């Protein structure tokens, strides 16, 4: 599949428009439970000087996107109250239906810092890449994350002190997350600005492995999946192989192409480890391409999403 074939040919009308400049959180999609690996800082690179609605040009942040803060209804209730999910949408200015990428966040490291649960995840670099090519980008926040309702309960230890390395608890958390992905997908398909014939799903870290498992469950909706450094539990965790390989193998049920993007010096998943997950996926019948990205010296490969020079050409050819 070639992403360029999904893009409208009409140019973007970006002139004489003024947009509210909002400071957006570009973190919170980091690790995936357990201890990080040695050899790289677990912190993301410095924040982009422009937010997701603008692009740096000659030292000035040039407006490129319209931001929409929305809420997706779900079939879930907690304590007798309906649960809705925060969805941050960026799209080109003007009316119309746009090819859409739904991009899912990761975890919060090891799950022990509750102050991170309320941070809303968006990616300015990914947004600019897609919006400038005529796409709508949606960033859903799963239950208990960002400004979404509900309890954040994606595979915690029984005392909720952090993410669990136990296979049963971790996979139960993944199933809960996949239910959220289903609810958001259903809601997006009803929006007037979404071209439901041209949709991709993607994510980073936990969001990446969720995108693979989800696309196999909704092949009638999505044309492909973008997996940035995907995994559910870090390779330092006890049951990591059983957990991650189970979810990767599930993604093999999708009949279309998938794209796997992993960085060297990743503090949670080494390249050989991630390639083993890809092998499990392909042996199970999955279709995909595995790419190794090399970030700048000293940068943590788990945050390659922040450097489009590493992956823009690869996605363009996908």
What are these regions (language model features)?
Residues 24-26:
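C-terminal motif of bacterial Sec signal peptides marking the signal peptidase cleavage site
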Residues 224, 229-289:
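The feature captures the conserved acid-bearing segment of alpha/beta-hydrolase catalytic domains
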